[in-house]
């Protein structure tokens, strides 16, 4: 029998969560996936994901990435430089981040692993069950697609306070599908 990679839970109280979103502009959906699919998705991310690195050091700098599929000469020195730059920006109180990432949409569009599990994940995120859930929760009936990026926070990684408002790019709503195990602590 095939493993479930992405299956929504039957226990989501859509009406209550939609009311909360309407009141606050944000909502947390606990246990949005079935336990089996959450375990399988967590395993995919932990064992079959070639993580790159995304960084930003202050508002004036561009986001820099080290892609897992696009290694470049000098990446080791670049890594040291961007670690120092993100440290300095964070110390100054500027917007900064440093985390591991896998650009699911870019990987899909560029054919990194045609038909592989990350492609299938993106298809599930954009399939009717998930899109209908997001439309119902947000009241945004015109939503047609979702972007996707996997993000991993390892020791030394961080994300500064920020806004996910990307209206100029056509975004209507941002989402986070948190795959962290229960023992996680914010520090």
Each model region followed by its residue ranges:
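Fe(II)/2-oxoglutarate oxygenase catalytic core
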Residues: 1-187
